[in-house]
């Protein structure tokens, strides 16, 4: 297997040396490039970074959550995935029912005030446990609305119906593989003004040639150190699952990013990662008894021979 880190590492270097220093909504500041692109040939191994540990279990559970059309964090919490907790927690602490400590600007305050962080961590733990234990509470406060799962599988129509974009694109790949309309979108202009965080992964398109299925993602904004490593592995897994259902071999994952940026408080971590030597890419194992995307569960997806460097911690810009 080949080293699959190189395209990512090369882009990190290019941003650090050629990028534009910009302000951003978090106040942290970034160095960014516009219109970056990376290409990964999945026949050369599964493209999950090896120069630091990337938690594949979180990637699996999040993608399966999207593909279920689920928008409630309860499924994620059942699989010990806390990626989306803060969005649901915000709904709870800003509701009239919440009577606990003041949680205004909890994301920023929890990073800057150790005393507040202890209070925040306790409230978050209680919230997550209540989501797991209380179905009615989970239905009311665990639902995130029109996030990726809803847009992919239940895109609302003007007539009151919905479009299942994933089912539609799978059928089109099978019946009309040369189509240039093999597209799934998550960007709904009507929802953007009211969204806490409008979709970063705006659109992806499939391409069939020589019995291989490829996928290109257009991502409007990419946090290169923390977010993009997840995105690379997640969409490579999505490509692999849909290739399985459509009876095709895996081709390329092409990752196009509008604003590819490194936060200024991640510069030291990036320099550390760039010093590390990559390992060969692991192999993705999919249960040979499963074919349909909808049938896959956590145990049906594994990485074989995933060697990696240690975790490199970095603060989240909020």
Curated annotation (Swiss-Prot):
EC number: 2.1.1.45
Organism: Lactobacillus delbrueckii subsp. bulgaricus (strain ATCC 11842 / DSM 20081 / BCRC 10696 / JCM 1002 / NBRC 13953 / NCIMB 11778 / NCTC 12712 / WDCM 00102 / Lb 14)
SUPFAM superfamilies xref list: Thymidylate synthase/dCMP hydroxymethylase (SSF55831)
Lineage: superkingdom: Bacteria
Keywords of this entry: Cytoplasm, Methyltransferase, Nucleotide biosynthesis, Transferase
GO process terms (BP): dTMP biosynthetic process; dTTP biosynthetic process; methylation
Gene: thyA
Record: active site: 200
GO molecular function: thymidylate synthase activity
Chief place where the protein resides: cytoplasm
Subcellular location: Cytoplasm
Source lineage: Bacteria, Bacillati, Bacillota, Bacilli, Lactobacillales
Protein's recorded name: Thymidylate synthase
């Amino acid at each position: 297997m080949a080293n699959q880190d190189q395209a990512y590492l090369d882009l990190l270097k290019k941003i650090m040396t050629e990028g534009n220093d910009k302000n951003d909504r978090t106040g942290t500041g970034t160095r960014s490039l516009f219109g970056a692109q990376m290409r990964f040939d999945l026949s050369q191994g599964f493209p999950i970074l090896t120069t630091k540990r990337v938690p594949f279990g979180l990637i699996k559970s999040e993608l399966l959550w999207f593909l279920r059309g689920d928008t409630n964090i309860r499924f994620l919490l059942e699989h010990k995935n806390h990626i989306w907790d803060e969005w649901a927690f915000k709904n709870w602490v800003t509701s009239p029912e919440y009577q606990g400590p003041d949680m205004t600007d909890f994301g920023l305050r929890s990073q800057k005030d150790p005393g507040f962080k202890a209070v925040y961590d306790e409230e978050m733990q209680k919230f997550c446990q209540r989501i797991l234990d209380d179905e009615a509470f989970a239905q009311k406060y665990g639902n995130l609305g029109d996030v990726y799962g809803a847009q992919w599988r239940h895109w609302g129509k003007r007539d009151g119906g919905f479009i299942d974009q994933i089912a539609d694109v799978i059928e089109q790949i099978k019946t009309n593989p040369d189509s240039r309309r093999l597209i799934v979108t998550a960007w709904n202009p009507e929802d953007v003004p009211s969204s806490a965080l409008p979709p970063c992964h705006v659109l992806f398109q499939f391409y069939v040639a020589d019995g291989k299925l490829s996928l290109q993602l257009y991502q409007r904004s990419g946090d290169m150190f923390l977010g993009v490593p997840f995105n690379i592995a997640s969409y490579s897994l999505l490509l692999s699952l849909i290739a399985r259902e459509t009876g095709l071999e895996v081709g390329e994952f092409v990752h196009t990013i509008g604003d590819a940026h490194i936060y200024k408080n991640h510069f030291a971590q990036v320099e550390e990662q760039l010093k590390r030597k990559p390992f060969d890419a692991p192999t993705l194992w999919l249960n040979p008894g499963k074919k349909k995307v909808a049938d896959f569960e956590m145990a049906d997806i594994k990485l074989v021979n995933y060697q990696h460097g240690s975790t490199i911690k970095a603060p989240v810009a909020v």
